[in-house]
């Protein structure tokens, strides 16, 4: 019997298909994967430790830089956790705008996913189309928050400001074009022979294994597990909206692709419902100890200026205790565990990033596959190193 030699190959950290500075040490028997050891940490910035030296409001910009493709989802999970510790109620208008922005963020993130996933496998046309559509959402981001990526728009107690005049019209014009674009993506990929051959039966992980590994989000639902925090543990008023939660059947890369496509259609559906229910009103809770004063007060009265300065420089005390809050981010369950000692800064903050947990299953999904198929598995997990390394 012929002996075989195991070859060790390094993929990354400078490799286009790893979607960031991810290094994987791969052991191969010929071209068949025997073992994968991910090496992370190249993008570590110490977000959790930095938060211990910043007030609760000053930590919000740090969360933008976790999954930098979905900044408002990061903001949302964090401010919900702090609001739970404070026990404050958020105005209905602010809740609705948060949902709209969270779903636009989901669309924006999924568009990057389908663009890069398709490009990794060789479908360049979808890459160009998806980035064209993403640009429309980026323009909305810029109009609302002043920034295209690191938005820093949500605040403890609500929003940094109300939306601009014409916001509803602009959002409707953008999302009304999306169903046609989704049809185009499906026409280019779903029945494409090369796409089907590269994704069907690839990266299989059973429902039981997916749960055991702690996988969440579209990767979990692609394995047939019907779980979505927006429906099963609702927050920000998601219980008011009607939407489908897609699940896969064959637990492979193709199923995860189909799940995300349907999720994009459902995000458009949720945004339409939220726009229909958007009512006039305040966008910040009436809690002067926590929320910033209106800008007109800051500019026109010394009391308002002092109020703003005190909150910005000293923060606000948060009752002693601990809390865990999770949201359904585009890549899965994003959770914040915050411990307060009664001061204006977190005593400890622990972030549960979905990409970090999902990456742990990469060997289970790819073992026994060809090394060329690993690119498709990485793409279907939709990882981002900003939140993995934190």
Curated annotation (Swiss-Prot):
- Reaction catalyzed: a quinone + NADH + 5 H(+)(in) = a quinol + NAD(+) + 4 H(+)(out)
List the GO cellular component terms: plasma membrane
Enzyme class name: translocase
Entry keywords, A to Z: Cell inner membrane, Cell membrane, Membrane, NAD, Quinone, Translocase, Transport, Ubiquinone
State whether keyword Membrane applies.
yes
What are its E.C. numbers?
7.1.1.-
Q: Does the keyword Cell inner membrane apply?
A: yes
Gene Ontology terms, MF aspect: NAD binding; NADH:ubiquinone reductase (non-electrogenic) activity; quinone binding
Entry-linked InterPro entries: NADH_Q_OxRdtase_suD (IPR001135), NADH_UbQ_OxRdtase_49kDa_CS (IPR014029), NDH1_su_D/H (IPR022885), NiFe-Hase_large (IPR029014)
SUPFAM superfamilies named in the record: HydB/Nqo4-like
NCBIfam families per UniProt: NuoD, PRK06075.1
What function does the entry list? NDH-1 shuttles electrons from NADH, via FMN and iron-sulfur (Fe-S) centers, to quinones in the respiratory chain. The immediate electron acceptor for the enzyme in this species is believed to be ubiquinone. Couples the redox reaction to proton translocation (for every two electrons transferred, four hydrogen ions are translocated across the cytoplasmic membrane), and thus conserves the redox energy in a proton gradient.
> What's this protein's family per the entry?
Belongs to the complex I 49 kDa subunit family.
Protein name, entry field: NADH-quinone oxidoreductase subunit D
Q: Which organism is it from?
A: Geobacter sulfurreducens (strain ATCC 51573 / DSM 12127 / PCA)
